[in-house]
Amino acid sequence: MTFPKISDVTNLDSSSLAEEILVIKRELFDLRLKRATRQDFQPHLFKHSKHRLAQLLTVEKSRTKSTM
């Protein structure tokens, strides 16, 4: 599984961007919960989810800065 490209994120509108951020945060929470309860999980998904979240937050921040 490869990392998602930032060009995919820049094409999203503001509402879907905010929705995607919530989805990724929920995925990270679920992964942490699985790790804490010693359930089966794929550790590489932490890195992928964090990378995706960083991309989403970067685009969101740049959009809010550009409107100021």
UniProtKB/Swiss-Prot annotation:
InterPro entries the record matches: Ribosomal_protein_uL29, Ribosomal_uL29, Ribosomal_uL29_CS, Ribosomal_uL29_sf
Main subcellular location of this protein, as a coarse class: plastid
GO terms for MF: structural constituent of ribosome
GO CC, one annotated term: cytosolic large ribosomal subunit
Any Pfam family: Ribosomal_L29
Localization: Plastid, Chloroplast
Keywords per UniProt: Chloroplast, Plastid, Ribonucleoprotein, Ribosomal protein
Entry-linked Gene3D superfamilies: 1.10.287.310
An individual GO BP term: translation
Similarity comment: Belongs to the universal ribosomal protein uL29 family.
PANTHER family: 60S RIBOSOMAL PROTEIN L35/50S RIBOSOMAL PROTEIN L29 (PTHR10916), LARGE RIBOSOMAL SUBUNIT PROTEIN UL29C (PTHR10916:SF0)
Protein name: Large ribosomal subunit protein uL29c
Originating species: Pyropia yezoensis
